[in-house]
Amino acid sequence: MMNNQSMVRYQDGSYDFGSSPSPPVYSPIYRSPPPPPQPMYGTLPQYPRFLDNSHHQVMDNSDHEQQQQHHHHQQQQQQQQHHHQQQQQQQHHQQQQQQHHQQQQQHHHQQQQQQQQQLDKSYAPSNIVSELQRKIQFLEEEISRKRDTIEGLQSQVAKYEQEKQSEKKKQSRYWTPEEHSRFIEALSKYGHKDVKSISQYVSTRNPTQVRTHAQKYFLRIDRERGRKLESKESINGGADKDDDWLREEYNDEGSPTQYSSCSNSPTTNSVANPFSNSLIISSNNNNNSNSSNNNNNNNNNNNNNNNNNNININGSSGSNSNVNSGNSSPLIKRKREAVTITATQAKSALLYKDAVLAILPTSWTPSDYEQFSKGLISNIDQDDIHSLCKLIKENFLPMQSMENIESAYHAFQKAVLKQKDINNNNNNNNNNNNINNNNNNNINNNNSNNNNNNNNTNNNNNNNNNNNNTNNNNNNNNNNNNNSSNINNNNMNNSINNNNINNNGPNSPNLLSSQPQQINQQIIQQQLLNNNNNQNSNQNNNNNNNNNNNNIINNNNNNNNNSSNNNSNNNNNINNNNNSNNNNNGNNNSNNNNNNNNNNNNNNNNINNNNNNNNGNNINNNNNNNNNSSNQIIQQQQQVQQQQMQQQQMMMQNQIIPTLPMPSPQSQVLQSQFQPQQQMQQQMQMQYQQQQQQQQQQQQQQQQQQQQQQQQQQQQQQQQQQQQQQQQQQQQIYQQNLNSNSGNSSPNISSINGDFVRSPNYNNKKRPPPVNVSRPEFPVTPLSGSPSHSPAQSPHYNLNNGNNNNGNGSSNSSSYSGNQSPLGLVPSPSLSLHPPSPLITSPTSHSIRWPGPLNNTLMYDYRRMEPSHGINYVPLQQSPHAPPQQSPHFNNNSNNNNNNSNNNSNNSNNNSSGSSGINISDLNNSSDENNNSSNNSSNGSGSWHQYQATDSPTGWGMNQTITAFSNTSLSINNSQS
């Protein structure tokens, strides 16, 4: 029996594709029924349902749903009833199955026929065509719907592209007229500083674009205004076209246009222009006339006065305009005045707020001025003042009158021009100040140099007293007196020269006139008095100058010598401390002398400069006199000078003051005029001679000093030679000791193994300093008890001082003190089997420097016991028992006292030799070591004694080594404690 629910049927009628989806029970997507039987026309394809914006959802009508539900409900009821009947028949007729089997088959066959009939009806060709038509219609509608969406998207893309292009056009650097008009409106509304508000008002430009547009706009206005003014001035003509606006006459006194710059304005009442150059030039001329008579410092004050005058003039003119601002005559026809202020000046209108409000009437408030500044910058493109003020009144200041606004404009213009004039005057004043300050600084520097002369001489006195040089003290005292006298003389000479210049000016026709003669006589008398009083002082100064110059030359040589002496003294300090101290004292004296000479040099330079200045003044006087005098007077002057020169030469030769010939009346006048010059020449000659004498004396003194220094150098060289000889002698003794010990020591290492032979120059190389046991970093611990057997004398420590005792090896050498580590001192006769290996790091494989006489030799020269790879020691040739006789390498207890005394002697010797840097412990220890030699001689033969073999650490040799090492101050236990 086939299930009727497995089939999905479509009712006849119109199919609604736009309704809500049907429940999922009736959709083949959400159900999986069993496969239906094959109909007669084959299976129908399951077409997907294309719905608008609801993917795979079934659309259905409410009426159609009710019909389908009713039809399916009837089928379900029929099927349920039929099944129920079949079950009842099967239950009641089980026993009668065979009888009713045919009836059931017939009934079943009838049902199949009914079903086939129903299928034939449902799947008729007409139904299939209608279904296909519906689907085609649905697909066409779907296609049209998709086309509409595509067209909508394309239109949106086109709009987006158009908007992009329009935005690009908006962002272009070229502003449209509408944008510019909005910009002007925003500028008048918000001002030029509120860029954000302007950009929002324009609505197509960002703030940066607004800012750049405003800058270009204002700059264009300034350029156009400048061109207009230039063209206007060129039309008016005249050479002074830049100053035309300053020379123009104004209107009536009360009108606000009295400050106008219009050239065609009528002149009702001529008022002086406060900005004209005539007033400024006249004031400058007056001040300059004053400054010519005064010093350089007065120029600065005069320039400042100019500025003050300008300010007062401007202020007075502004106050008059304020008082009479209301008396303007409206009947006068005047031409519209051009706007002369620039946009940059209008933008800075708030800077002139206080200056303008001070001129304007009291009815103006700061807020009114702010509105005025906004209107000024927003309407700066206006060409004439009347239209500018009219726009300001209409848009910004409706409560103020046109006259007040025009007066505010002129006040602002006046403040701008006043600031410009102040800036120009400041620039000029700065230039003048720089020149005047330079002159004053030069004068002050010269005065400071003179003051330094006095200070330097006082310092020289102190230094010379420390050195106890009487000659230098006398010279310095003279320098003090002479410096003071020079200053006075220079001042007097300068005053005299100034008087001569004024009197001998171009106004005086002749030198023989009455007034110049009287003045010259007074001047000559003053000069005679001053020169007579100060001749000696000037001579002393010149002499001192010459002496100091010689000192400069000689002291340079002395400095070189001192530098060489210092180097030699440093070398001597290493060897002899006493000699180096003496040399240092000498060097200190020389250094003090050099300091004094340097101070004298400063004085010489300054004094010479003063003398040159005086000479220059005299030359200037001569030039003035020559310009004012005739040729005859010049010739007479030359004759008089020649006579005076001859007389001075005679005085110098004979040292007798001759009588002067009586001059003529004309020559008397000339002599009275030029007598100061003659006296100056005489003083110069006397000073020159004295300078030469002092130079000779100083040269002699310097030669003596050089000789003394040479003697000191020779003494130092002799001391160095003596020290070198002593060092050579000590080295010879040391080498002799080494050579004498080489015969008694162990076999040469070089004969056993040639690879370890050192170069002959090995001893000459620089080595680290010896380890001094007496130093505080190596504390010597006292022995608690009697030390163990230690090698009192060993052939390895054999350093004879040229004395061999029968060749037994028991020579006078330094004993083993107990403070030395004996690890490497146990000899091994089988050295050929165990050569010294410097590459192995063992306690004795590196170079160790021992105190005492062994400080110049390395431990490579001695036999040593080296550990090989474990605790295996060098095998010796005897049994581990005690030796049959005592070894010469170890002393008895009786020798320990000698060892302690040797330690003390070594310490004392090291301390004493620390000053010279040379250890001479060989000589000092020789006397202490005689006891050791006697003890060693009693031990038997001095030849090598063969030890017993120490194959284990418990051997006798190892025990002796350990006990000896434990008693030393360099042991591990003592170092840790």
UniProtKB/Swiss-Prot annotation:
Q: Where is the composition biased (Polar residues)?
A: 254-275, 505-516, 783-797, 944-960
Instruction: Mark out the compositionally biased spans (Acidic residues).
Output: 241-252
Record keywords: Ion transport included? no
Its recorded name reads Myb-like protein I
- The set of disulfide-linked cysteines is none
Per the record, the gene is mybI
Q: What SMART domains does UniProt report for this protein, alphabetically?
A: SANT
Skewed-composition ranges (Basic and acidic residues): 52-68
Task: Return the Low complexity bias intervals.
Answer: 75-118, 276-329, 422-504, 738-754, 798-848, 887-943
Domain HTH myb-type, residue spans: 167-222
Tell me the DNA-binding residue spans.
Answer: 195-218
Extract one GO cellular component term from the record: nucleus
Q: What is the annotated localization of this protein?
A: Nucleus
